[in-house]
Amino acid sequence: VLHPQGYDSFGLPAEQYAIQTGQHPADTTRMNIEGGVDKSGNTIQGYRNQLDRIGFSFDWSREVRTSNPDYYKHTQWIFIQLFESWYNKNSDKAESICTLIQEFEKNGNAKVNAVCDDNIAPFSAEDWKSFSSEQQQKILLQYRLTYLAETEVNWCAALGTVLANDEIVNGVSER
């Protein structure tokens, strides 16, 4: 039996380590997985070497790294699909945002039965056509399956990075 192997190697811990050591996250991640000598001259064994020494039969051709563009391009693609969709309660499925725009152009939003923000003002087809492109985009954001929103960010000026919620205790960085 050949076992696949994967590394969840994308995100704040990898970025934080790179900031602390003054190295690019791609370099530190690759070094941690493959091993070698880092910029400080330290020998890094690497996860792959350690796993090979255990004696398991890993199929390295099936290795997955979440930091690899071949992996995360699929995640990005999924979010684009979600962003370009809205949920039509009448058909009980997600549909292309283009169908919603067509409905707005023909009838406004009076007959739209969608999962959306609660505070959407009714508008007619004439209203829709008179809205600026920016106004139309703001309205569409209220219907999209994924959306942009203002939110609080835990910025740490001392570290020069955003901190995850679990790194904040009583409003102060744990680091």
Q: Model-flagged regions — what are they?
A:
Residues 1-175:
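N-terminal, positively charged nucleic-acid-binding surface of large information/translation enzymes
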